[in-house]
Every structure is written in structure tokens, then in C-alpha cells.
């Protein structure tokens, strides 16, 4: 399975209304364990790598800056009844040489029970809207080429294959 880098132009978009009972806010380092558990649980069993402890450590590494400078305004978590059900983690720029010089979504994940309700779309709109007001008004991300549902979502949201720089 190959990873593809996709990029979209940032644009101010009216936010989607969340379904009743959901709340959107910026993630905090205090959310690390809950985010890590959600990250692990959101993966289908065949696609999981490692265990919940490794997922929590990956989120901890994100907040420690290992994936770039955390951008709280473009990132988001969605809660329902006090439980995290979806998250998008973004940085001002990814630290890897092969990524575009623009904001980058490092992770986007949704509890399997809450998929197809517009939560990921709402989080992406928040990120694209924030990016639209920056000097680098684009957003990039990586996705596994065989992740058809994610590819469809990203294409509908305006993401396309990264062209030459």
C-alpha cells in the first residue's frame, strides 16, 4: 500500500452544523490519553498497528512537536456526552522533507459508531478555513492509497494529488 500526499487550497467555508448533542473544540495536551484511545479504537482491527499504548504515545509525540508545530486553531475534536468521538490534528508545517511547505493534517479519525455523520467533514472545513487566512493558504495530508472511503472524502473536499513543487 502506497501513501499519497494530497493538497487542497484553504478556503473560508461556512461551517456545517453539527448534529444535536455534538460539540467542537480545539484539542489539548490533557486529551492525550483519550485521543490515543480513540485513535486506536477508530482503526478497523486489520488496519491497526501496535496497541492502545503505542497509539497514546503517538498522540503524546504529536503534542511534543515531533510532527511539527501544533496548530490548535486548525485542529479540532468533537465530543458527544463528554466523550471524544472524532479528531483532526494539524500542524503549521510537517517536518518531513517530502511534504509541501504548508499546514498539514497529521491525523483525522472518527469513532466507527459515529462515521458518515459529517464529523470528519466539519473538522476538515475548520482546518481549510483557518488555512485560508494564512500566508500559505493550502493544507496537505497523507493517505493510504487503498483507503477508498478516506480518498473519496478528501476528493470531495477539494484535495488532489500533490503536483511538482
PLM regions and their residue ranges:
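Conserved beta-strand in the GNAT
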Residues: 75-77, 83-92, 104, 109
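Active-site rim helix/loop that mediates acceptor-substrate recognition in acyltransferases
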Residues: 52-85
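Conserved acyl-CoA
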Residues: 104, 111, 122-138, 160
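Conserved beta-strand-loop-alpha-helix junction that forms the acyl-donor binding cleft
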Residues: 112, 138-151
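A short beta-loop-alpha structural element at the N-terminal edge
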Residues: 23-37, 48
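Conserved active-site alpha-helix within GNAT-family acetyltransferase domains
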Residues: 1, 117, 121, 145-163
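Acyl-donor-binding surface of acyltransferase catalytic domains
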Residues: 1-21
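Helix-loop element at the rim of GNAT/NAT acetyltransferase active sites that forms part
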Residues: 37-53, 66
Amino acid at each position: 500500500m502506497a501513501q499519497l500526499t494530497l493538497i487542497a487550497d484553504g478556503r473560508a467555508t461556512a461551517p456545517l452544523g453539527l448534529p444535536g448533542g455534538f460539540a467542537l473544540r480545539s484539542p489539548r495536551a490533557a486529551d492525550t490519553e483519550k485521543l490515543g484511545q480513540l485513535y486506536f479504537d477508530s482503526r478497523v482491527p486489520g488496519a491497526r498497528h501496535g496497541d492502545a499504548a503505542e497509539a497514546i504515545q503517538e498522540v503524546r509525540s504529536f503534542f511534543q512537536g515531533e510532527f511539527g508545530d501544533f496548530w490548535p486553531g486548525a485542529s479540532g475534536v468533537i465530543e458527544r456526552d463528554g466523550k471524544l468521538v472524532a479528531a483532526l490534528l494539524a500542524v503549521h508545517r510537517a517536518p518531513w522533507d517530502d511534504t509541501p511547505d504548508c499546514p498539514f493534517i497529521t491525523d483525522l479519525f472518527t469513532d466507527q459508531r459515529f462515521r458518515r455523520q459529517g464529523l470528519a467533514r466539519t473538522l476538515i472545513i475548520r482546518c481549510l478555513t483557518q488555512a485560508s487566512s494564512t500566508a500559505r493558504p493550502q493544507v496537505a495530508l497523507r493517505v493510504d492509497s487503498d483507503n477508498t472511503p478516506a480518498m473519496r472524502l478528501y476528493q470531495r473536499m477539494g484535495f488532489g494529488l500533490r503536483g511538482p513543487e
